[in-house]
Amino acid sequence: MSLQPDTLLELSPLLRMQWEEAQQRYVILYPEGMIELNETAAAILELCDGQHNLTSIVDKLERKYDASGIEPDVREMLESALNNGWIREIIAY
């Protein structure tokens, strides 16, 4: 599935992302288990709150980490998350 740069994104309502002290990292909890996230994935998914799209996520991360040219990597991660059902697009009517 191809991600549109201006489509708002949110974490799937079937999942919950939280800090897991035992693993010392963020995880996604789902009914059948848990997915451990690295720091980068967690930073990206935290911005999937229904208020941000690909463009604004990239902008915020570039400012936060004083980085540039990260759009292809962020897009790849978000498309993978979308295809795995971790996030969903919010369609504005």
UniProtKB/Swiss-Prot annotation:
Keywords: PQQ biosynthesis. The keyword Nucleus does not apply. GO terms for biological process: pyrroloquinoline quinone biosynthetic process. Gene3D superfamilies: Coenzyme PQQ synthesis protein D (PqqD). HAMAP family: PQQ_syn_PqqD. Functions as a PqqA binding protein and presents PqqA to PqqE, in the pyrroloquinoline quinone (PQQ) biosynthetic pathway. Monomer. Interacts with PqqE. This is PqqA binding protein. It comes from Methylococcus capsulatus (strain ATCC 33009 / NCIMB 11132 / Bath). The gene is pqqD.
